[in-house]
């Protein structure tokens, strides 16, 4: 499931829904939107970081990076 969420968020970054260097929805927002646990949302965000789609800033949030 986390891979599907990561693909959905990556698609939003790619199509400009989440512009580069802009804050993206929180893990809590992802949990609510997709009906998943916090652990699943964290796994999706970790995959997005690994793939270069987002960057995380502790205490500030997660930001879109654009197409990796």
What kind of region is each of these model predictions?
Residues 1-36, 42-55, 60, 66-68:
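Extreme N-terminal segment that seeds HTH/winged-HTH DNA-binding domains in transcriptional regulators
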């Amino acid at each position: 499931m986390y891979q599907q969420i990561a693909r959905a968020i990556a698609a939003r970054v790619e199509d400009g829904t989440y512009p580069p260097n802009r804050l993206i929805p929180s893990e809590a927002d992802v949990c609510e939107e997709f009906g998943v646990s916090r652990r699943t949302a964290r796994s999706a965000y970790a995959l997005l970081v690994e793939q270069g789609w987002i960057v995380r800033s502790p205490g500030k949030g997660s930001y879109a990076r654009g197409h990796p």
